[in-house]
Amino acid sequence: MSFASETKKELTNLEVKDCCAKAELSALIRMNGSLSFSNRHLVLDVQTENAAIARRIYTLLKKQYDVSVELLVRKKMRLKKNNVYIVRFSENAKLILEELKILGENFVFERNISEELVAKRCCKRSYMRGAFLAGGSVNNPETSSYHLEIFSLYKEHNDSLCALLNEFHLNSKTLERKKGYITYLKEAEKITEFLNVIGAHNSLLRFEDVRIVRDMRNSVNRLVNCETANLNKTIGASLRQVENIKYIDERIGLEALPEKLREIAQLRIDYQEVTLKELGEMVASGKISKSGINHRLRKLDEIAEQLRTGQSITLK
């Protein structure tokens, strides 16, 4: 089961107050519902591919309105051939839609979230939970990027949902997609805050555990890469220095060098793998700083270059 599916399953088991149940139902029906007429009666179908969400809708409807509700199961004939669950009812459908602030006067569909419906902070949380159950998805925290989004068919609803999330300082943003709109979060901290707001506390803990391990692993990898790069740089410089020193020895002999340069040249030949700092600590005449060692090695590089190009040699 995916992380998003586990999160939704957890949410469908939450107990809610009556006012919050209506807010959650409003989001679920508004985003997943469709209306039709049968025998001159208004019929409402709420469709989902998630069995737990279908049971949630069924239970909330029965608890809040005690109406006759059907639960149908169909199988998709294309692509994944998943089951499709349809929660269907016609009894008092218009009145329920009006109470849930989905239908207004004269059978007008309300595309914005009703302020009255989410007047209480607990109801705001519940509407957000219903919206996530209806159209939400969240990446597994083990994947390459953090991303949570909620899909809406209508721009007005998407904008009001984004504003609702931002009442909780979630820094959510909106984006138009091919067949609708999304409200999304990209920051890991904001995703965990959202999970907390909608009541997915177990999923929040799992998300944080995985994120901490992942971030720690990334930090270790960056450190290792940095150390590897520095090591490669050190090895590359050492090989160049040794090559130049050997060239000097072949052309004029190390004995021709001033004592200070000869001493460093011999140490570098003998200890090719050590750093400049370590090399400075090996000088018999006394410890030399890293910059001092670097200066002498650069001087040896210059002498080797002068020999290669036939220039006059400066040994001092």
From Swiss-Prot:
Keywords for this protein: Cell cycle, Cell division, DNA-binding
Keyword field contains Ubl conjugation: no
BP GO terms, sorted: cell division; regulation of sporulation
InterPro entries given in the database record: Homing_endonucl, Sporu_reg_WhiA_N_dom, Sporulation_regulator_WhiA, Sporulation_regulator_WhiA_C, WhiA_LAGLIDADG_dom
DNA-binding region boundaries: 275-309
Keyword Transmembrane helix: no
GO terms for MF: DNA binding
Any matching Pfam family: HTH_WhiA
Similarity annotation: Belongs to the WhiA family.
Protein role: Involved in cell division and chromosome segregation.
NCBIfam families hit by this protein: DNA_bind_WhiA
Protein name per Swiss-Prot or TrEMBL: Probable cell division protein WhiA
Organismal lineage: Bacteria, Bacillati, Bacillota, Bacilli, Bacillales
